[in-house]
Amino acid sequence: MKLKKFTRRRFILASLFTSLLVATDARYIEPNWVKTRRLRLSNNPSHRFVQFSDLHYKGDRAHAKSVINRINSLSPDFVCFTGDIIEEAKFLPEALEILSGIKTPMYGIPGNHDYWSKAPFDDIFKCFTATGGAFLEDDQRIIAGGKVNLMGVAHLGPNHPLPAPKPEMKNILLIHYPAWAKEFNQKFDLLLAGHSHGGQVRIPFYGPVIVPFLVDEYDLGLFQTKAGPLYVNPGIGWFPYPIRFNCRPEITVIEI
């Protein structure tokens, strides 16, 4: 009987200790513990660039600047941002000031929070253009010496023609919502998305506890879709709660 009581006590203490460790990690460690993931999609890649997503800037200047410094240290050919700079328009000026520190052409698309915040998009366009890139709200650019066709889709519907891949180029499509990959009949060399945050909390051997709308099965990582390979970045920031578990913020270095 004593052994049973002792074992139960140890189990309770171990459970409490484990819960404390998980809570500490999820609240104070992982949200700021940015990792760099490398994704090689070709045996002989000719382009090396960075994707990051879902900054959700809320005034956390030091964290955001450390992300930009990390991106610059990687010396990519160009940078792709897949939506959600902010949640509130009041944070946009400071967020754009920080983003303007990127030292290579930056291309991006809006996310749902960028629209919901009613932020002045003219300022966003100017910021991205100043880096040598562009904000691709249903737009596209031929970049990398005419070798890459970079497209951004912000809306779907009859009033918004879908971009056309170009032959003999690498065709890369930026979308915010991963589930939109199901809507394209064209074939792309790569689709990039954000929005999901990877679920923010991922249970080992199970996956995300919850994901937002328009994610479906494309919650995190590389997927094969009818439109081509889709990579879903887990983002930098968080919403609505400042927690991450088993789902660190990520800067993705892609070779294609």
Where are each of the predicted segments found?
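Membrane-embedded segments
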Residues: 50-126, 130-134
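Membrane-cytosol interface motif
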Residues: 43-51
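His/Asp/Glu-enriched short active-site or ligand-binding loop at hydrolase and phosphoryl-transfer sites
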Residues: 199-203
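Short, surface-exposed loop/helix-turn segments at secondary-structure junctions
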Residues: 204-216
